[in-house]
Amino acid sequence: MIQALLVIICLAVFPHQGSSIILESGNVNDYEVVYPQKVPALLKGGVQNPQPETKYEDTMRYEFQVNGEPVVLHLERNKGLFSEDYTETHYAPDGREITTSPPVQDHCYYHGYIQNEADSSAVISACNGLKGHFKHQGETYFIEPLELSESEAHAIYKDENVEKEDETPKICAVTQTTWESDESIEKTSQLTNTPEQDRYLQVKKYIEFYLVVDNKMYKNHTSNQELRTRVYEMVNYLNTKYRRLNFHIALIGLEIWSNQDKVDMDPGANVTLKSFAEWRAKLPPHKRNDNAQLLTGIDFNGTTVGLAYTGTLCTWGSVAVVQDYSRRTILMASTMAHELGHNMGIHHDKANCRCSHSPCIMSDTISDEPFYEFSSCSVREHQEYLLRERPQCILNKPSRKAIVSRPVCGNNFVEVGEQCDCGSLQDCQSTCCNATTCKLQPHAQCDSEECCEKCKFKGAETECRAAKDDCDLPEFCTGQSAECPTDSLQRNGHPCQNNQGYCYNGKCPTMENQCITLLGPNYTVGPAGCFKNNRKGDDVSHCRKENGAKIPCAAKDEKCGTLYCTEIKKTGCIVPVSPRDPDSRMVEPGTKCEDKKVCSKSQCVKV
């Protein structure tokens, strides 16, 4: 087993009370200076630990002093930072797309904690010295190298000692008009979860994250490497914030619009968000992702620095836009975490929401102080969203082979050669898994999967995943495995929603639901007479497009062309305009068009 490297920081600490220095984070008016020196750890018998096979160690420890007291900082490489099929895309001056798969597994981005402190954490980049932050005795400290010739000096300081870039409060443009009523949230927060729901919430979930940098932000950086480093640091920080929600964020791709922007960039954040969502919907399969964010150098109108659709995981709208408004990486990452929270079904915190280290991530104002954690309101609202919508893409966990570099016991990833991995000795709460060896305890068959209870396989025919609706099927444990079988769906054509529709690929598409989705709850499907317009074959009313021409519907197929809606208690024919793309105004495939008939390829055919 490769032993952890012990690195001791031999300190000469010089408090600079009242002094000021310009660091990467800005003007810092009070800091301490430390001088790191690496010392190899010794194995038993006094033998020196061999040189690592990779440039950066998988685990490290740093010993130093904070306020005159010694601390030991444990670091573990964030092995899941990049997905197995991570790609980077940029564009040549002539517009040619250049996509590569760089070797990123031997990276220098770490998570960690302070030894003997239960409520501690750390996010560190060790690429060129130590840069990041750690929480110690309830206080957050930042560390970064000092740019002094022939010196390994680092500065340690608190956030309160960084002069603010701009006193104007920033905002997220998601407004209260998109919230549910307080009454409905209060009612759901009082509900008790079923055992099946609790099991679902406890299952580890994953976001395959795609990040895009626009042309202006690209031009604002001196080199591609500087830009990549900044992005990696943001995602490393983002990853730690979602641990409480039991999510792991894996960067699946970075795209830099180095030649020109691929969408219309507009100071109106809502316009840019819509354009970005439309662009993402057309990405090729090799750039698939669960969520995408656009980082932009443009200045959004007013004090807006971010915007996202709410409750859109695993859909076309799982996107956000964030303005590159601060040179401080942690502030940018805080805003990214905030916008991703909206995609995960979380609204802004209300006045009665609290977290132990304010401001909370979903605060309605984005200040110059970093966000550190979700409030209890956010956690509960996110859980209600997951239980209500059951987004499927987040359950696709990386295979063991996706971890290309050497396995590390204690990183919460079950890798090749491991039977379980419950985290570090400090974090592990499992009675089934040995945190030191990542092997099951002698009495255990399993650890924490859906078909595991008290370290034993659940009996055959024990339900492990309930049917979420008419078009889903329940899954049952086999009695031979801890894994719940793959999610299975009701057959296409099975009646659903009281015969209002027929199942199609796990959903129950109806015209009424499509109108509500596109226009809101005050709308329903239009009268039958509206659909006769589809016989025209004009730009608005038609059945399909062929080589740019609008093809009219036959009379029997008129309900399989353009969708018509109407406002409840009113008359008229309304063609909805989707923020996704113009084609989504068409009646969706699989929608019921007559009794025992559904739309297929713009025709009304038998089920």
UniProtKB/Swiss-Prot annotation:
It comes from the Eukaryota. GO terms for molecular function: metal ion binding; metalloendopeptidase activity; toxin activity. Disulfide bonds join 314-393, 353-377, 355-360, 409-438, 420-433, 422-428, 432-455, 446-452, 451-477, 464-484, 471-503, 496-508, 515-565, 530-573, 543-553, 560-599, 593-604. Residues 205-398 form the Peptidase M12B domain. Expressed by the venom gland. The keyword Ribonucleoprotein does not apply. InterPro entries: ADAM_Cys-rich, Disintegrin_dom, Disintegrin_dom_sf, MetalloPept_cat_dom_sf, Peptidase_M12B, Peptidase_M12B_N, Reprolysin_adamalysin. Binds 1 zinc ion per subunit. Its EC number is 3.4.24.-. Ca(2+) 3 binds at residues 472-473, 475, 487-488. Ca(2+) 2 binds at residues 411, 413, 415, 418, 421. Its cofactor is Zn(2+). Residues 1-20 form the signal peptide. Ca(2+) 1 binds at residues 208, 290, 393, 396. It is an enzyme of class 3 (hydrolase). CDD domains: ZnMc_adamalysin_II_like (cd04269). It is found in: Secreted. Residues 21-196 form a propeptide. Residues 406-492 form the Disintegrin domain. A motif (D/ECD-tripeptide) lies at residues 470-472. Monomer. This is Zinc metalloproteinase-disintegrin-like atrase-A. It comes from Naja atra.
